Amino acid sequence: MSEDKLKALRKQIDEIDEKLVPLFCKRMDTSLSVALYKKENGMPIFDAEREKAILDSLSESAGKYKGYASVLYGTLMDLSRALQHDVIDSAGAVPAEETVRFDASLPCHVACFGREGAYAHIAACSIFKAAEIEFFPTFADTADALLRDDRFDYAVMPVENSTAGSVLEVYDLLINNPLYIVAGIEIPVIHCLLGVSGAAESSVKTVYSHKQALSQCSEFIKAHGMQQVEELSTAAAAFRVSQEDDVHVGAIASKLAASQYGLEVIKEGIQNTSNNSTRFVALSRKLSSSDDADKISIVFSLDHRPGTLYRTLARFAALGLNLTKIESRPKHAGKFEYMFYLDFTGNIDREETWRLLSALKNEMQDFKVLGNYRDRGVNIN
């Protein structure tokens, strides 16, 4: 193909686009008129059966481009629906009665996963400045304390590690219980080999730690031929070593755990990668908001049809919302059905953002705002 031929074809596409843009604008204007009619007559925005019938008909008429047409018109319908929500859901930002204001400086009672000296303990102390902290051995116990005991205002647990991935059990607790994220913090993970006085790298034959910490230090463990034993947390491992008082056992934990349980740091920084950090979240029984909140976490499910996820994500793009994480998780109730976890930058006090979330909630069977919170960077203190 000659360069002149390519230029001619591109010019033809440009001419087609020039015709499409006015038609797109006209379609959106008409959609606005439909929204006003629906608002005046108390009609719902979303009519799933009608949209499916129209989409199927338009796709079939596209012949060999059926699949492409389905994505195109599906996206157009989603954008039109979003525009209609702007008209009908005109109440503005999130209603005040649906959220509480979060203030980490106030005295509070916190349920924390693990033991004194664990990374979760470091996270809790970094988030809350005047907290009474109580520790629990499992994620379920920590969540249960917050849910069932009114003495607790918050709970702190890990949700993601930069090398080991998401802590799926915590995400499951979030979706299956009335729990909401109110703060997030990223803590650098500097794993140390801890032991009693007199212990050395050469003397330690068995190492205790949480399963994720063992995974993150797998190269060091393998190189030294150590046996691995899982504990509920890194701090629990340190406590066990302090109780056994044996130079042949060691724990993988933090320097704080060493000082907490009277152990020595045999070697510092034994993790596989130096760029290792864990993201922790503070949870509450109520959805919160704050002026400096910069991240929103949601979870939802979609019909198992081609293009549904793409179309959903396109609505975030249309508002200029930056997605920072998306992950799928199998639904317990359905075979080959999935929940999607999504993080994006934003604040629900922004009117357009709240309208989008309200629209998605109305259109999806399973939808939950997990939280709107400030997500702090790596804490080096």
Language-model-detected regions and their locations in the chain:
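Domain-level signature for soluble enzymes in the chorismate/prephenate branch of the shikimate pathway
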Residues: 1-381
